[in-house]
């Protein structure tokens, strides 16, 4: 599904549209131009993840109480996979009702890391 960028991904402000592809219940692929990101469903590994979005960002992304949204986090994939890191402080929010998206900095970002190791949430083999 294609989404129009309302709040750009930091460092990639020139990209105006992205295509989101579900890989499985945990991982997603986000493509725009020549750029590709691996995204992760934060609730699959951190059920207590608390997403507090500013009123200004909610307005820009047209988020209401009944909006069909998806929250995903950017992941830097490494080998082995346990060495990958996740940005929990600034998730990417997808509004499926309006096909718009944006990266936000959480109101409670101080509670989260930009580079939280995946190893903190999965068991090694």
Language-model region placement:
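Short active-site loop/helix that positions an aromatic residue
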Residues: 55-65
């Amino acid at each position: 599904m294609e989404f129009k960028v309302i709040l750009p991904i930091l460092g990639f402000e020139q990209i105006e549209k992205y295509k989101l592809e579900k890989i499985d219940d945990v991982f997603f692929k986000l493509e725009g131009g020549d750029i590709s990101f691996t995204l992760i469903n934060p609730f699959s590994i951190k059920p207590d993840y608390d997403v507090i979005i500013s009123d200004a960002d909610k307005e820009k992304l047209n988020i209401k109480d009944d909006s069909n949204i998806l929250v995903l986090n950017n992941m830097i994939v490494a080998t082995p996979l346990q060495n990958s890191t996740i940005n929990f402080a600034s998730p990417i929010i997808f509004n499926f009702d309006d096909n718009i998206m944006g990266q936000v900095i959480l109101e409670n970002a101080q509670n989260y890391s930009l580079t939280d190791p995946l190893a903190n949430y999965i068991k090694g083999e």
